[in-house]
Amino acid sequence: MMKLKSNQTRTYDGDGYKKRAACLCFRSESEEEVLLVSSSRHPDRWIVPGGGMEPEEEPSVAAVREVCEEAGVKGTLGRLVGIFENQERKHRTYVYVLIVTEVLEDWEDSVNIGRKREWFKIEEAVKVLQYHKPVQASYFEALRQGYSANNGTPVLPTTYSSSMSGIR
């Protein structure tokens, strides 16, 4: 299913969830520092860069496109961390690891909406996300637990609050 938004087409899965993709953008392979971007709705809050998938777009391709648009970085795409479900907002987000190899000085969202970006230690990133973006904070828990993907489907517990199923 698709819906047109003013400047984009939203895509939905069979359950009516918006299909999204995002990356945990790490400064290096040690995965100690992650890049967060300012929210377009709440510029004083930090979020993981990501967004809606285009029709017929593979999740990995969408993830790379979104981080370039939102965070102004390019890099080496790594493993799928998981597919995360936000029942409140009806989103399913494919989250990947990306090792940053190039940081653009000017990028689409910095020019168009004044979006900012900043490197955070993992613990700090979790702290700034857990209040207003608990599902995004859970990305790091899944990463830390190090569950491996089973044919692209992560094998992870669903032990998050009732307003979100956490990880599918």
Curated annotation (Swiss-Prot):
- Kindly state the positions of the motif Nudix box in this protein: 51-72
Q: Which UniProt keywords apply?
A: Acetylation, Cytoplasm, Hydrolase, Magnesium, Metal-binding, Nucleus
Q: What is the activity regulation comment for this entry?
A: Diphosphoinositol polyphosphate phosphohydrolase is inhibited by fluoride and InsP6.
- What InterPro entries has UniProt attached to this entry? DDP-like_NUDIX (IPR047198), NUDIX_hydrolase-like_dom_sf (IPR015797), NUDIX_hydrolase_CS (IPR020084), NUDIX_hydrolase_dom (IPR000086)
Q: Where in the cell? A: Cytoplasm; Nucleus
**What top-tier enzyme class does this entry carry?**
hydrolase
- Domain Nudix hydrolase: from-to ranges: 17-142
Q: Name one GO cellular component term.
A: cytoplasm
UniProt family annotation? Belongs to the Nudix hydrolase family. DIPP subfamily.
Q: What is this protein called?
A: Diphosphoinositol polyphosphate phosphohydrolase 1
Source organism of this protein record: Rattus norvegicus (Rat)
